[in-house]
Curated annotation (Swiss-Prot):
InterPro entries: SH2, SH2_dom_sf, SH2_prot_1A, SH2D1A_SH2. Residues 104-127 are annotated as: Disordered. Gene3D superfamilies: SH2 domain. This is SH2 domain-containing protein 1A. Residues 67-92 are annotated as: Interaction with FYN SH3 domain. SUPFAM superfamilies: SH2 domain. GO terms for cellular component: cytoplasm. Interacts with CD84, CD244, LY9, SLAMF1 and FYN. Interacts with NTRK1, NTRK2 and NTRK3. Keywords: Acetylation, Adaptive immunity, Cytoplasm, Immunity, Innate immunity, SH2 domain. Cytoplasmic adapter regulating receptors of the signaling lymphocytic activation molecule (SLAM) family such as SLAMF1, CD244, LY9, CD84, SLAMF6 and SLAMF7. In SLAM signaling seems to cooperate with SH2D1B/EAT-2. Initially it has been proposed that association with SLAMF1 prevents SLAMF1 binding to inhibitory effectors including INPP5D/SHIP1 and PTPN11/SHP-2. However, by simultaneous interactions, recruits FYN which subsequently phosphorylates and activates SLAMF1. Positively regulates CD244/2B4- and CD84-mediated natural killer (NK) cell functions. Residues 116-127 have a biased composition (Basic and acidic residues). SMART domains: SH2. The modification N6-acetyllysine is found at K89.
Length: 127
């Protein structure tokens, strides 16, 4: 799981929410450990100022699945990256497609509210 750039490990729900809200972009998402269910992960997605959380778990055979909206057929994936790719498409049982990954390695101090990285060493001067 550590190889997945959007996996933040054992961060609190509140910390995850702050990271997502800081982007200000609907469709921003990250993965974190569940605080209430050991061995389960949470896929957290920002939409209209709210954070929607979907439980992601691995079966005994190693397949990955996510709890989605009621009535949506549960799908299984060989790799967590395949699950994320599938949920980047519309109508997959989550509130909005995954669009903007919030990566653990992203330097928070250089991440603007637009979600676009700004290089603090680059300055443009008007003529």
């Amino acid at each position: 799981m550590d190889a997945v750039a959007v996996y933040h490990g054992k961060i609190s729900r509140e910390t995850g929410e702050k990271l997502l809200l800081a982007t200000g972009l609907d469709g921003s998402y990250l993965l974190r450990d569940s605080e209430s269910v050991p061995g389960v992960y949470c896929l957290c997605v920002l939409y209209h100022g709210y954070i929607y959380t979907y439980r992601v778990s691995q079966t005994e055979t190693g397949s990955w699945s996510a709890e989605t909206a009621p009535g949506v057929h549960k799908r299984y994936f060989r790799k967590i990256k395949n699950l994320i790719s599938a949920f980047q498409k519309p109508d997959q049982g989550i509130v909005i497609p995954l669009q903007y990954p919030v990566e653990k390695s992203s330097p928070r101090s250089t991440q603007g509210t637009t979600g676009i990285r700004e290089d603090p060493d680059v300055c443009l001067k008007a003529p």
